[in-house]
Design a protein with these regions (language model features):
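Bacterial N-terminal signal peptides
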Residues: 8-17
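Bacterial N-terminal signal peptides that target proteins for export
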Residues: 1-9
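Exposed beta-strand/loop interface patches that mediate assembly or binding
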Residues: 25-130
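Sec/Tat signal peptide C-region and signal peptidase I cleavage site
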Residues: 20-24
């Protein structure tokens, strides 16, 4: 019996020692015919306010100069925004997808085009099983 416990503990230690936590890359911006910025990582937090804005906070902040290099004038790099009134159905789907990702500890990929209230404006989201 002690041999099984030792084997189990060794395998557990090996699994923990060799696993790497999911760490997000800094959001990056691409200059293409349709300029956009993209984030792949964890949903650090998600926030909704009475002004009808949803903010998704990045695990690793965006470098504001990266956004300005593709023509986006943003003041805040730690989050991206959705203005709910622009597209309420998309905002609802986005919020539920982001919450599902956060609850299941899965990374998301989001793309942002344009800006709103000093934040990059989110226009799509992916949730992929890891």
């Amino acid at each position: 019996m002690p041999r099984r416990i030792l084997l189990f503990m060794s395998l557990l230690f090996l699994a923990i020692a060799t696993s790497t936590p999911i760490r997000a890359a800094t959001p990056i911006c691409h200059s293409t015919p349709h300029n956009y910025c993209q984030y792949h990582g964890m949903v650090k937090s998600i926030y909704v306010n009475s002004g009808n804005i949803i903010l998704l906070y990045f695990d690793t902040p965006l470098h504001i100069n990266s956004a300005s290099s593709v023509g986006f004038n943003v003041s805040f790099g730690e989050a991206a925004a959705i203005y709910i009134n622009d597209n309420p159905e998309f905002a609802n789907l986005f919020y539920s997808t982001a919450l599902a990702a956060q609850a299941s500890n899965q990374p998301v990929t989001i793309q942002m085009r344009g800006e709103h209230s000093g934040y990059l404006k989110i226009d799509r989201i992916w949730l992929s099983k890891q």
